[in-house]
Structure formats: C-alpha cells, structure tokens
C-alpha cells in the first residue's frame, strides 16, 4: 500500500478549497482517506493555509509521499527542510 499526502477538492463549482489528506494512492481524489492533516484555500487574500506539522512529519517518516503540489506547499512552510535535516541527521 503506497500512501500519499495529497489535496482533496472541496467547495462548490468555481469556488474550490482543498483539504490536505493522507490517503492510499489507489483511492479516488475525493474519496476515502486515512487522516486529514490540513487545509488550503487559494481564493482568500492572503492565501489561507493550515498544516499540522507534527502529524505531517510523522507520516513523512513513515514513508508517505507528498504530491507535487503538496510538496511545494510544505517547502514554502519549511516542513520539507526540517524533514530533510531530521532524516540526514540520523545517519
């Protein structure tokens, strides 16, 4: 089972917001997920982004792979940098 951290589309037509979820890679985009770890609303000014950093770090250490878009959001928040530092500090 490959686990991904990805965005689940919510909201109405032409007014999307996204929940950032941990899901099995085989489940549909808006389908079943394991855990919600944040949300992202691109329509507000400034952009509304909330991430549960400790939970995301835990999933990354367990081997979950972020999607490209989620990886960019995590990088902007500095979470990917902390993950890489923690990962290479152990070796």
From Swiss-Prot:
The keyword Membrane does not apply. GO terms for biological process: translation. GO terms for molecular function: structural constituent of ribosome. Transmembrane segments: none annotated. Keywords: Ribonucleoprotein, Ribosomal protein. GO terms for cellular component: cytoplasm; small ribosomal subunit. It comes from the Bacteria. Belongs to the bacterial ribosomal protein bS16 family. This is Small ribosomal subunit protein bS16. The lineage of its organism: Bacteria, Bacillati, Bacillota, Bacilli, Lactobacillales. The gene is rpsP.
């Amino acid at each position: 089972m490959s686990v991904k951290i990805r965005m689940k589309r919510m909201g109405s037509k032409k007014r999307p917001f996204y929940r950032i979820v941990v899901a099995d890679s085989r489940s549909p985009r808006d389908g079943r997920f394991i855990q919600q770890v944040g949300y992202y609303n691109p329509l507000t000014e400034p952009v509304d982004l909330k991430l549960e950093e400790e939970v995301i770090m835990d999933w990354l250490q367990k081997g979950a792979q972020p999607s490209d878009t989620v990886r960019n959001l995590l990088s902007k928040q500095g979470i990917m940098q902390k993950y890489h530092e923690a990962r290479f500090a152990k070796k």
